Structures are given as structure tokens and as C-alpha cells.
Regions:
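Blade-edge beta-strand/turn elements of extracellular beta-propeller
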Residues: 67-78, 114-126, 163-171, 209-217, ...
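Beta-propeller blade signature
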Residues: 7-10, 63-68, 108-114, 157-161, ...
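A flexible loop/linker signature enriched in serine peptidases of the S9 family
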Residues: 1-5, 25-33, 52-61, 76-80, ...
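Generic long, charged, amphipathic alpha-helical segments
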Residues: 210-230
């Protein structure tokens, strides 16, 4: 097919369920152009929210359907950026509206099933140069609103249980300074280029009374990436000499080591969560190199075992021993 398929299966079962098939959806609509912006499943696994551009305008319509019946549960939301974030109780979605200049400058909260005229304006960016987005922190305690241009960012936060969200500023914007906050295990992490050309990660126990201390200091000619959090682990990335590296930190011991995944000197690793619950030692670890097609492994951070779950098929065939890097 030409478009993505979204599958899911319950943990420890072999029953795979198809909840989205882009080719079938395009055929059903009978449109020439079919752009998918976002596909999000609700926290209770009952709803699928998706955004479509069927004109090539990059203005997306948001739809929400009941997965079990395939029926829409709310009126389509028009003129959005396409991104969708469910509230933790799955009663609402957050989305951003595009203005006439095609910029996302307003964040709204929509109660599923309600009329669109009742949508609540959570945040509005006054500068025409900045665009906004909303996300959930890794510990699912806060929503973060990020407003940014290509080299400056600013973030606001509010609690997931706030009935009437009132976003609070984290750090006032400074020209040329990028920062991105996350929270995990009662700490806040700031991935920023403030006094760190190639970024660093600072840590603070509070956003109300910020006291930022180094967590991963800046390094000369090393690009510091962000963090992925699991119950027992923090996974982060670095890039140096054009090579990507992954580092695994045990939260209880604070011991950190590089994840050496291959004896090849040149390869590109990437990780993704294996399951929604972060109380796990397992991740999906993607891997590719100039001589090896893309592979995805199930990787156990505790015992370092791995299992191949998917490999890119090369129609003409492939033998990695035929190549030298």
C-alpha cells in the first residue's frame, strides 16, 4: 500500500488488530489527495483520533471514532495543525488552530461529543513569528505548551487535573535560546542550549522554585540529545564525529554506560517504547547501517538480551558480507 497501517496487540497475546488502514480510508473518501497528520489512540484504548488533509492545503480536519464500532463520536474539527493530544481521562482532546497565515497560534480543548462552539481556548501566542504545540510529560503529571520559532522557544505548563487550565510560564523566552522540559520521578529535566552550543541537560526538583543543576553537562563538539524515561532507566543520545550513540542510566544506582549494539563502527540506532506502561525493562531498538538493512529488535535493558522482531526486506536480495564500510 501507499499509506500507513496502524496495528496493535495486547501484551502477552498474539492477536493483532488493525485499527487504521490508510489505503482503505483514502478509497472510502474517494479523494485524490490524502495526507495523514496524526493518529492517536486514547488512554483507555477505545477511541482513535486522526487528522486528514484531503486538499493539499495542510489545513487538517480532526476526526474521532469509536474503535469498536468505527463510528465518529464528535463533529469534525477544521483548520487545525493536525496534532492531537488526549486528556488523561479521555474526555477531551487538545488541538491547535491555524490562522490565515498558516501558523498554529492557539491551543484549544475540545470535550468529545460537545459542540465546537464550546471549545475552551487554553493558550494564545501573540507573536506572529511563533507557533504553538501541546504535549504530555513522560510521568503524565503535566501538559506542556511549547511556543517557538526556528531558534527560540518558551514553555508553559499546567497540571493534568486542572479543570480550567491556566498555563504557567516556565522560563521566559530569550532570543537564540531553545529549551525543552520534561518531568519524571519528581524531577524536572531541561534540554537546552543556554550556555551550551551543543546542548546540555539540567535537573531541578521544582518549577515553582527553580534550581537547575547539571545532569548531563555540555561537551565540546558533542551534540547532547534528549531523554527517554522508563521506571528504572533513563536513555539518552549523543552525536559526535557524525556517529550516534545511546547511553543507558540505571536510576537506582545512577550508573550510566553506552549501549554498544553492534561491532560495526558506523550505524544509526533509535529507540521507541515497546508498551504504553513505562514499568518495563524492554524497548524497541531500531538499527541500520550502510551495510545492514533496517532492523528492529526487542531489547532488554536489564539482561541486555535482544530478539529480532522486524527486518527490512530488500526486493533484489541483500548480503551484508558483500559490503565494506
Amino acid at each position: 500500500g501507499n499509506y500507513s497501517i496502524k496495528l496493535r496487540k495486547k501484551i502477552n497475546t498474539d492477536n493483532v488488530e488493525e485499527i487504521w488502514n490508510g489505503d482503505k480510508e483514502k478509497e472510502k473518501l474517494g479523494v485524490e489527495y490524502f495526507g495523514v497528520g496524526d493518529l492517536e489512540v486514547s488512554h483507555n484504548d477505545k477511541l482513535l483520533a486522526y487528522s486528514l488533509d484531503t486538499k493539499g492545503s495542510e489545513y487538517y480536519k480532526i476526526f474521532i471514532r469509536d474503535i469498536s464500532t468505527n463510528k465518529l463520536v464528535t463533529k469534525e474539527i477544521t483548520d487545525t495543525s493536525g496534532s492531537i493530544t488526549f486528556s488523561l481521562d479521555d474526555k477531551y482532546i487538545f488541538y491547535s488552530k491555524l490562522d490565515e497565515n498558516h501558523r498554529a497560534r492557539k491551543i484549544y480543548r475540545h470535550k468529545i461529543g460537545d459542540h465546537l462552539s464550546e471549545d475552551y481556548l487554553v493558550f494564545e501566542e501573540k507573536s506572529e513569528a511563533f507557533t504553538v504545540g501541546i504535549s504530555l510529560t513522560s510521568d503524565e503529571k503535566y501538559y506542556l505548551i511549547t511556543t517557538s520559532d526556528h531558534n527560540t522557544s518558551e514553555q508553559y505548563y499546567f497540571g493534568v487535573d486542572e479543570i480550567t487550565p491556566k498555563p504557567k510560564l516556565i522560563i521566559k523566552r530569550q532570543r537564540g535560546i531553545l529549551y525543552s522540559i520534561n518531568s519524571w520521578a519528581n524531577n524536572f529535566y531541561n534540554h537546552t542550549n543556554n550556555d551550551a552550543e551543543d546542548f546540555k541537560i539540567d535537573i531541578s526538583s521544582s518549577l515553582e522554585n527553580q534550581s537547575w543543576k547539571p545532569f548531563v553537562p555540555s561537551k565540546n563538539e558533542v551534540l547532547i540529545g534528549g531523554c527517554v524515561f522508563l521506571k528504572n532507566w533513563i536513555i539518552r543520545s549523543e552525536t559526535s564525529d557524525a556517529l550516534d550513540k545511546l547511553f543507558i542510566r540505571n536510576i537506582s544506582t545512577n550508573f550510566e554506560e553506552e549501549l554498544i549494539f553492534s561491532d560495526e563502527k558506523v550505524y544509526v540506532p533509535n529507540i521507541s517504547l515497546k508498551q504504553k506502561d513505562r514499568n518495563t525493562d524492554e524497548i524497541y531498538l531500531g538499527y541500520s547501517s550502510p551495510k545492514t538493512p533496517s532492523r528492529v529488535y526487542s531489547y532488554n535493558l536489564s539482561d541486555k538480551s535482544k530478539k529480532l522482531v522486524k527486518e527490512q526486506e530488500i526486493p533484489s536480495g541483500h548480503n551484508s558480507e558483500d559490503y565494506i564500510v
